[in-house]
């Protein structure tokens, strides 16, 4: 039997909202596999949220830069150890500079981008090293994304740089309404974090996995086998409307879907508009901050 630690139980509880004993039992049944334990809790109706195991804990900033005609955009995430440093002006300037360099570069990986020359006359990596020495805290240029399109691209920053979203739209229109639409869609993505743009992108593996979980969930609820299939179909349909961007209810107007919003703007500008890609960065996504017991920390300082 796998060794189930208190930390594993704590992580599963935080990611699902289930009770401590339920989390422990699920981990034991899943032999320590965190994702399988999440599925088991969902099947039993004990998970309050279909979150994946793991939590967001790192600090830092996301920044976006865009060219003048909204056909090229870049987005970067740079992490710091504390929120205090994330609010430091030197740190903010570095993140903005990194986004500007990402916008101008043809490089596709961080290592190559860090090797490019900064406006200070040294490499971006050397500038980063200097900031680390000045600020006195570890900084990490974690990732960047770039969108280049013949259509239009819009961006949105939420929470002062905690979440950033880029939205690529396929369209011939050059109208302020299109950019406003792009920002509205980006806000939707920031708030609702959809897995897919449209139902066409949903892969068969996801459908099979969710069908299995929902079927087991219905059976565990004691539903008759003859109506389980119908129930699963209905629940899966509801879930797809939640994970597919275009089928989501628009957060600024719950009377319409995002798909209807896009269609309305397309009609208003007299040109087809298709949302083809979204990129969403959330600061610290998937990174777990190091935690120490306060008593242990004090003990270390006394040694």
From Swiss-Prot:
SUPFAM superfamilies: Elongation factor Ts (EF-Ts), dimerisation domain, UBA-like. The keyword Protein biosynthesis applies. PROSITE patterns: EF_TS_1, EF_TS_2. One of its GO terms (cellular component) is cytoplasm. Transmembrane segments: none annotated. It is found in: Cytoplasm. GO terms for molecular function: translation elongation factor activity. CDD domains: UBA_EF-Ts. Residues 82-85 are annotated as: Involved in Mg(2+) ion dislocation from EF-Tu. Keywords: Cytoplasm, Elongation factor, Protein biosynthesis. Its main location: cytoplasm. It comes from the Bacteria. Associates with the EF-Tu.GDP complex and induces the exchange of GDP to GTP. It remains bound to the aminoacyl-tRNA.EF-Tu.GTP complex up to the GTP hydrolysis stage on the ribosome. Belongs to the EF-Ts family. HAMAP family: EF_Ts (MF_00050). This is Elongation factor Ts. The gene is tsf.
């Amino acid at each position: 039997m796998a060794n189930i630690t208190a930390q594993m139980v704590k992580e599963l509880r935080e990611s699902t909202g289930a009770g401590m004993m339920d989390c422990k039992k699920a981990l034991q049944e899943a032999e320590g596999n965190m994702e399988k334990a999440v599925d088991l809790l969902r099947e039993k109706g004990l998970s309050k949220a279909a979150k994946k195991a793991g939590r967001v804990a790192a600090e830092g900033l996301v920044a976006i830069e865009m060219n003048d005609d909204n056909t090229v955009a870049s987005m970067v995430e740079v992490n710091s150890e504390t929120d205090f440093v994330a609010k430091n002006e030197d740190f903010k300037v570095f993140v903005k500079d990194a986004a500007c360099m990402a916008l101008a570069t043809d490089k596709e990986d961080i290592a190559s981008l860090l090797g490019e020359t900064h406006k200070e006359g040294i490499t971006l990596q050397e500038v980063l090293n200097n900031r680390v020495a000045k600020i006195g805290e570890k900084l990490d240029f974690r990732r960047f994304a770039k969108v280049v399109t013949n259509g239009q691209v819009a961006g949105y920053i939420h929470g002062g740089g905690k979440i950033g979203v880029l939205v690529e739209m396929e369209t011939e229109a050059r109208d302020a309404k299109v950019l406003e639409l792009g920002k509205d869609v980006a806000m939707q993505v920031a708030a609702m974090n959809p897995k897919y743009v449209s139902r066409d992108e949903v892969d068969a593996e996801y459908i099979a996995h969710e069908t299995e979980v929902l079927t087991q969930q219905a059976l565990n609820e004691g539903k008759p086998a003859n109506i389980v299939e119908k129930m699963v179909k209905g629940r899966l349909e509801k879930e797809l409307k939640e994970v597919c961007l275009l089928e989501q209810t628009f957060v600024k107007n719950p009377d319409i879907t995002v798909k209807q919003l896009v269609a309305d703007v397309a009609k208003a500008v007299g040109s087809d508009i298709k949302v083809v890609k979204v990129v969403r960065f959330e600061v610290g996504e998937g990174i777990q901050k190091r935690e120490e017991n306060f008593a242990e920390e004090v003990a270390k300082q006394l040694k």
